[in-house]
Amino acid sequence: MATINQLVRKPRAKQVVKSNVPALEACPQKRGVCTRVYTTTPKKPNSALRKVCRVRLTNGFEVTSYIGGEGHNLQEHSVVLIRGGRVKDLPGVRYHTVRGALDCAGVNDRKKGRSKYGVKRPKS
């Protein structure tokens, strides 16, 4: 335990909290342009072709963003909105593309969990 005199001379150091999504710079989402759209394979024990894209953000960062849902319409030069949220089995992927915003269309024929995939309410 430090004495009061020691604390007066050298106060306690504040703990620095490291962000999991530094490219967002404390914003909820950021806009960017796709520089490359491709598929990649997850780490063991999973197996798939995960759809991802490299995005150059408006603040100059270049990040890898996951494209959720079945099928997408993204290609190079598409303007997308990204949010935080990593993909556990893809190392280096710490962002998600927001479906149904800007150039990224919502998922076709999606009936459940629509809000996460940018789908409007179907006509009954």
Curated annotation (Swiss-Prot):
An MF annotation (GO) of this entry: structural constituent of ribosome
Stored Pfam families: Ribosom_S12_S23
Any GO CC annotation of this UniProt entry: small ribosomal subunit
SUPFAM superfamilies for the chain: Nucleic acid-binding proteins
PTM sites of type 3-methylthioaspartic acid: D89
Keyword Membrane: no
GO terms of biological process kind: translation
Keywords, sorted A to Z: Methylation, Ribonucleoprotein, Ribosomal protein, RNA-binding, rRNA-binding, tRNA-binding
Quaternary structure and interacting proteins, as annotated: Part of the 30S ribosomal subunit. Contacts proteins S8 and S17. May interact with IF1 in the 30S initiation complex.
Function of the protein: With S4 and S5 plays an important role in translational accuracy.
Family as reported in the entry's similarity comment: Belongs to the universal ribosomal protein uS12 family.
PANTHER family hit by this protein: 30S RIBOSOMAL PROTEIN S12 FAMILY MEMBER
Protein name as catalogued: Small ribosomal subunit protein uS12
The organism of origin for this protein: Aliivibrio fischeri (strain ATCC 700601 / ES114) (Vibrio fischeri)
Protein's gene: rpsL
